[in-house]
Amino acid sequence: MTRARIAVDAMGGDFAPEEIVKGALRAQEELQADVILVGDPDRLRAICQDHAPHLQVRIEAAEEAIAMEDAAVSVRSRPRASINVAMDLVKAGEADAVISAGHSGAVMASALLRLGRIRGIDRPAIGALLPTVIPGKPVLVLDVGANVDCKPRFLEQFAVMGSIYSRDVLGQANPRVGLVNIGEEDSKGNELALASHQLLRNNPRICFVGNAEGRDVLSGQFDVVVCDGFVGNVLLKFAEAVGSVFLEIIRDELPRGMRGKVGSTLLRRNLRRIKQRLDHAEHGGALLLGVNGICIISHGSSKAPSIYSAIRLAVEAAENRVIDHLHQIQEPPSPAADLVTEPVVS
């Protein structure tokens, strides 16, 4: 099997470049992937030498990096920024995917400007995989931050993209799509929800099963749920927080004393498995669906394990030719779709 080539923005993120490079080196050793580190060559070579001197890793020079406090549109005036250089590798066919833990708005802007949109998509969406009560069966939630304000047709397109990804990458034969709403009834919701419900119900390319209340999103009833980026970002951050709080509560309640130590030892084994299911680092990042290339946006606080998982996600998308499948969408986009907006994901 041909090894996937993954361009890694090594200068993006709170713990760049050290943690980014460590995660990338592990991925090159353990996955069917060749990583391309993009950033300051001297710093990257030094880190590679410290952690994996036996590996041959391609390093692509980039003279600048987009900081978290910079405006997303600064990518327009800084062509040699690390995220732009990484995107250019994908555009030139030298890489199959790009990942970045840097400024999410800049990542999206760079992807739009350099890779362009897939024909038929008005606005790309950020899709995050969240755990459900069914082991190994996450739900794809989109949009989680690229588009704060949406039109009904945007949500319809998110549903089609999410269904294609769920089917062709996650292996769900007939992905069940839900619309995040305040009630199960068709008549519930604001104007966006009501209009979107009508479009989703009448679209033959998706298996729309109805509204998804907040309590149902992680229930395993849905394979894909769609919403605007404002709601999705709140949902994503809340899910991450609940997982962390749940683990802390369990730790606090572990029995103490001699009798409790035996039980605690047994519980901790299960606790590790629970942590793996709830930890967002297990998925490593969110997919920017709708641009003409595979792009993974990792959390700004990502460390090596998250970067490794993000590269694994990118490899799966590349091996399953997700972009080829997304090109099934052939409706012409609207004229207003070329606008680069400021996403809310942090």
From Swiss-Prot:
The keyword Lipid biosynthesis applies. Gene3D superfamilies: Isopropylmalate Dehydrogenase. One of its GO terms (molecular function) is phosphate:acyl-[acyl carrier protein] acyltransferase activity. It is found in: Cytoplasm. It catalyses: a fatty acyl-[ACP] + phosphate = an acyl phosphate + holo-[ACP]. Its EC number is 2.3.1.274. This is Phosphate acyltransferase. The lineage of its organism: Bacteria, Bacillati, Cyanobacteriota, Cyanophyceae, Synechococcales.
